[in-house]
């Protein structure tokens, strides 16, 4: 069972009584056939639920009102099978607070050249019915997505499925609670921000709990629970000699297990699905949570270090969006560069906390080594390299008057040499279009040093995320040129200034 099983998407057909009962009967019949086929053949993450025809303002308003009140409804897919005068939709759309997708399709794929008549034309009017619906959306400044294609087309299926992921993610975000264990890393700017504005814009709440509250739960974990989790470690990872039974770091592994169990219990009891820690606020914990954080991220929790609640929330959001897709999603940081003409590379990592969902190894190494900051005992961590191939890194920043999402498309590559003295998980990539352009654009746009790294999601997913939340997006990819990028930032400043 996944998070998508908790939601459904309503399929709404727009028409009108002008065409008579027989036409509406055929419209309903077609809709039932299309919904059944999409549910069985399209591999959609959510179930489509067909709703009664929307043929009058009252019917349409009732559908939209019911969608708002139904917690299982993640959004609406609307198909204008016939012409549906858009003034009928104004009241409904004005109150709708769920994501909206217009599926611009028709029942038949090919025209029946020899038999087409006006009855056929009146029944199959998506071509201009969809334009009428599009006008009222534009007139009302209604955020909605559009997918064009025949309902049997696999590309249309993929695009509808991607939109469903966004719709479910938006509903989950409205309920998301972010727990900060301690505050931000002192004097750091980009990890701070306006939590009230974030809750108004996205819906997630951010609050702080003293590390001592967590420590109480950690200290209450039983030895039996620790032993059971250690057994799981033994079967899931390759333990170094120091971390095995009788190894000189075995107790550190046990303490890491205690912290993991305590953190998970605390998060579950509080209904949290994202959290932060900071190495400057560990009072009462024996080590910086490393292994615990890595494993919790793999279970779907959002996380970021140094109190970075925006990145923690973004990671949770992207984890939900990518549920069931191939490839992983992780907290990440641009750590250091490899400058070589024609082969500039970025080595991404963090002190400890990289999610094993992006690991290339089936069984990562579990090790305990010294950590030079934090002033605590040596922490346990998983060490691995990252899968290769196309990926993205994304950052959500607070500009005071708005949020900006930055996305850099990257190509993850195999590490050309072993890293015998680097005791942390890492990812190596080429930034698009090249490192100088990508880094300069990122810096000019104010991108954070913390990011969410994903093999599972792509630029289209993040564009749709920005659209569905009505936030600015700045894209850095192979098409990026710095003069045009700077111009886009200036234009955005004016555009969003007028939107205030």
Curated annotation (Swiss-Prot):
Sorted UniProt keywords: Arabinose catabolism, Carbohydrate metabolism, Isomerase, Manganese, Metal-binding
Domain of life of the native organism: Bacteria
Biological process (GO), any one: L-arabinose catabolic process to xylulose 5-phosphate
GO CC term (a single one): cytosol
Transmembrane segments: none
Catalysed reactions, semicolon-separated: beta-L-arabinopyranose = L-ribulose
GO-annotated molecular function: L-arabinose isomerase activity; manganese ion binding
EC number in record: 5.3.1.4
Residues that coordinate or bind Mn(2+): 306, 333, 350, 450
Comment on bound cofactor: Binds 1 Mn(2+) ion per subunit.
Coiled-coil annotated residue ranges, if any: none
SUPFAM superfamilies hit by this protein: FucI/AraA C-terminal domain-like, FucI/AraA N-terminal and middle domains
Pathway: Carbohydrate degradation; L-arabinose degradation via L-ribulose; D-xylulose 5-phosphate from L-arabinose (bacterial route): step 1/3
Names of required cofactors: Mn(2+)
Record bears the keyword Isomerase: yes
Function: Catalyzes the conversion of L-arabinose to L-ribulose.
NCBIfam families cross-referenced by the UniProt entry: PRK02929.1 (NF002795)
Family: Belongs to the arabinose isomerase family.
Assembly notes: Homohexamer.
Name of the featured protein: L-arabinose isomerase
